[in-house]
Amino acid sequence: MSELARPLPEFHGFNYRIAQIENNTHCNYKCWFCPNAYDTPAPKECMDLDLFAKILTEIRTVYTPLELNDISFATYNEPNLDDTFTDKLQLMTATGFMYEHISNGSMITTELTDFLIKHPQNIKNFRLNIPTLDEKKWKDITGAS
């Protein structure tokens, strides 16, 4: 039996129905409100596509789509820095998973937007974190140059 096989946790009577996957370990910003601004940076690595596919398969083996169907890339990273990110979204689409995407927007490519337009049925949430429209304040907040 998979080590993932366990009852879904309950919190105030609600079952969690989302899995969070860190597809890469880095971010291109150092926002003052994020641990990335203060922690020792992790090595810049992206999850192998085969490992990602294995994780999706294991989740689907243990949980039905009604039990767990959403994947979030909402960790302290920028998911779009992963060169295989669109491939991972294609795997998720092919296996019927929904995804939640939070990005600082800096690495959104034409390839990604074209994919999202063609497959809107798998987008649960797509959020951009743009802390201000003022350029100086934006640089101060994000640590960008």
Predicted regions and their residues:
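Conserved glycine-rich "GG(E/T)P / GGGxP" loop and the immediately following alpha-helix
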Residues: 13-145
